[in-house]
Swiss-Prot record:
Post-translational modification: Predicted to be exported by the Tat system. The position of the signal peptide cleavage has not been experimentally proven.
GO BP term, pick one: molybdate ion transport
Keywords, ordered alphabetically: Signal
Name recorded for this polypeptide: Uncharacterized solute-binding protein VNG_1595C
UniProt-listed PANTHER family: MOLYBDATE-BINDING PERIPLASMIC PROTEIN (PTHR30632), MOLYBDATE_TUNGSTATE-BINDING PROTEIN WTPA (PTHR30632:SF16)
Organism of derivation: Halobacterium salinarum (strain ATCC 700922 / JCM 11081 / NRC-1) (Halobacterium halobium)
């Protein structure tokens, strides 16, 4: 089957155990290791939830690395890294960068919501906790108060800029994006983004909801007009764009996490077992702070028979 197609959870649940059991029985030691390049926003999701559950259920060992999705896909496309599995926080970006040369299919398995997390004891945090609209409080904040991700390295960064653009329209504040510049400071990685908030270097950060939950920080989700969590607003999101250094224009789109097993994977069977495990356990993914609507999982490209039967 090609193109975008829903795949029922029953299909995954019905055969997940068989595939995991088969691969667990014939792969041990180093051969059972699965190298995963994953979006940085999934660090705690995988380490605290998915990895222990998967390793407990199988003889496989995950070897995850975490990077911004733009960075990890570039590492694969330029031949620097050769993982078994890739997981991107932008499904379209994964297809654009990997299809044809490196992968033939992608499974979309989760969504997320954009917003702002904060330290309640800070001046900005107190205003947010008191109900001041985030954008008014942010404009008034001291310089370098709000950490944001680098748009050149990961989708969180360019979604933040797009959200600021859409927020300007939503709140009838045409200069909002420029007015927010003094208060924001760009960080080179998603891990540093929240580490600097936790250590008190910054009062807040624009993040995905699961990241705030991972770090036990209060989270204010942006409205549907610019949180990239409402599929019915896809056309509206697409009105915001970001242009990369190489001239590629990226349009706003709903947040969707996608994964694939690479064509040159060293452990194809293990990689497929891991992808099936993600699709077959939506409650585990939800417990980690991600959203799994009824529309997921879906896929692009022709799924391997082992994943589609």
């Amino acid at each position: 089957m090609t193109g975008t197609a829903p795949v029922s959870r029953r299909q995954y649940l019905g055969t997940a155990g068989a595939i995991i059991g088969t691969t667990a029985g014939c792969l041990t030691g180093a051969d059972a290791s699965i190298h995963v390049l994953a979006a940085g926003s999934l660090t705690s999701t995988i380490e605290d939830h998915i990895r222990p559950a998967f390793e407990d259920a199988t003889d496989h060992t995950l070897r995850p690395e975490y990077h911004g999705s733009t960075t990890l896909l570039q590492l694969i496309s330029d031949g620097t890294k050769h993982p078994d599995v890739a997981i991107s926080a932008d499904a379209t970006l994964l297809r654009t960068r990997l299809f044809d040369a490196h992968a033939d299919w992608a499974l979309e398995f989760a969504s997320n919501r954009l917003g702002i997390c904060y330290v309640p004891s800070t001046p900005l945090g107190r205003r947010l906790a008191a109900g001041t609209p985030w954008w008014r409080a942010a404009v008034d904040a001291a310089p370098d108060t709000i950490a944001v991700s680098d748009p050149a390295l990961d989708p969180l960064g360019y979604r933040t800029l797009m959200a600021f653009t859409l927020a300007a329209t939503a709140h009838d504040a045409p200069d909002l994006r420029a007015d927010l510049d003094p208060a924001t400071v760009t960080k080179p990685s998603e891990s540093q983004l929240l580490a600097d908030v936790e250590t008190g270097n910054h009062a807040a950060a624009v993040v995905y909801e699961n990241m705030a939950l991972d770090h036990d920080l209060p989270f204010l989700g942006f409205p549907d007009a610019y949180n990239f969590a409402a599929p019915e607003r896809a056309d509206h999101y697409a009105s915001a764009t970001y242009t990369t250094d190489d001239g590629t224009r990226i349009h706003g789109r709903p947040i969707t996490y996608a994964t694939t097993v690479l064509n040159d994977a060293s452990n194809t069977a293990g990689g497929r077992a891991f992808v099936r495990f993600l699709a077959a356990n939506p409650d585990m993914v939800r417990d980690a702070g991600l959203a799994v609507p009824e529309s997921l999982p879906t896929h692009q490209g022709a799924l391997p028979d082992a994943l589609e039967r």
